A protein has these predicted regions:
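Signature of N-terminal electron-transfer/Fe-S-associated modules in redox systems
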Residues: 1-156
Length: 156
């Protein structure tokens, strides 16, 4: 039995330490927004934040998380109204939607590190998150729209 700090709360989980974090999040904790895509950490659909860093949860053992805070798409904003989530809806980014939680989680770290991202910044940080529907131009536009809203919120 170990404790997992997820989305601001502590959850006791009884799993082997080598169990992928993805399956603990989905099957044990019951948060299904994080998706299984490839199982080898190459597509980004399973991206969550561990200690504030984007992490591929399908290849991260729950034992490797330790006491770090895990944030999933459900924890990005308690009401689902993070500027990225609003921009995704406003610009109708998803087609099938399967990769989108991972895209948004990666983009959240991008905007933390690059509050005014260039196309080059976006492409560089988002390159490992694959979208089989090829909505990359809408993703870029949504990231830029969210960046504007986040700067406006920061400036009051």
């Amino acid at each position: 039995m170990s404790n997992l700090h997820i989305n601001g709360r502590t959850v006791a989980v009884d799993v082997d330490e080598d169990t992928p974090l993805l399956w603990v999040i989905r099957d044990v904790v019951g948060l299904t927004g994080t998706k299984f895509g490839c199982g080898i950490g190459m597509c980004g659909a399973c991206t969550v934040h561990v200690g504030g860093r984007p992490t591929r949860s399908c290849i991260t053992a729950v034992g490797a998380v330790g006491d770090a805070e895990v944030t999933t798409i459900e924890g990005l904003d308690p009401n689902g109204r993070h500027p990225l989530q609003k921009a995704w809806v406003n610009l109708q980014v998803p087609q099938c939607g399967y990769c989108q939680s991972g895209q948004i989680m990666q983009a959240a770290v991008l905007l933390r590190d690059f509050p005014t991202p260039t196309d080059q910044d976006i492409d560089g940080v988002m390159t490992g998150n694959l979208c089989r529907c090829m909505t990359y131009l809408r993703i870029r536009k949504a990231i830029k729209q969210a960046a504007v809203e986040m700067r406006e919120q920061a400036n009051g």
